Amino acid sequence: MEKAVHSSTTSGPAVPGETTKTGTSIIDTAASAVQSFAPVNQIHQHLCAFHFYADDMARQVEAHHFCSHVNEEMRQCLIYDGPDANARLIGLEYIVSEKLFMTLPDEEKKLWHSHEWEVKGGFLFMPGVPGAIQRKDLDKVAKTYGKVFHFWQVDLGHELPIGLPNVMMAVTRDGQLFHEMIQEAEKRFGVSVEGERDSRAYMSGPELGIHPLANGGGKGMKLELREVDIKPVESVGSVFV
């Protein structure tokens, strides 16, 4: 099978459409001067990791997470295919503590993946941040679970987001990620996966161990679309008086 790998914005196709016009830029600038972007302004962290499709491990994507804390036990992240200004918004991830994960229904748990080996293996890092500072937070991340959906299949060269959202998973052991993708990221960001792995050896995952239903429960997962009867408007209670 041919590998479908997307390493960064530099390896993706150009998005079709006209170049942003000067008039549009002026309007955007004027609006940004008076509007609040409070949710986006809460983003405090850039994490780089690698995701694979939950139904096809040969399809792998470099994923740049721009995250904010909802509270001490939950983060929410916008995912881009690169760190540059022209990066494509390809997905999102919710990250929760082990405590919150354990409150989820069993069927829901299958959609979430563990972060222990992603962190301890050195595959998740903060571009530009010294290792010692990274490790203070990543020690916490190693104990969490994440739920990821990607909406844009950049690894297939799609110029626009086409098709259904895809459930994504994270690395759980060695040998799952293509070596050339890791090497390319190491070169671009000046990091060492092996070096970080050694430095993170003291870290531990969830206190109760990785839940057996996490990571798809060991099975592949894929969303499917089916037609259903739509609820007619007459059956919806009136909201106006």
Swiss-Prot record:
Signal peptide: none
Location of the region described as Disordered in the Swiss-Prot/TrEMBL record: 1-22
Any Pfam family the entry gives: DUF1264
Biased composition (Polar residues): 1-12
PANTHER family: OIL BODY-ASSOCIATED PROTEIN 1B (PTHR31360:SF0), PTHR31360
Family as reported in the entry's similarity comment: Belongs to the OBAP family.
Protein name per its UniProtKB record: Oil body-associated protein 1B
Lineage, broadest ranks: Eukaryota, Viridiplantae, Streptophyta, Embryophyta, Tracheophyta
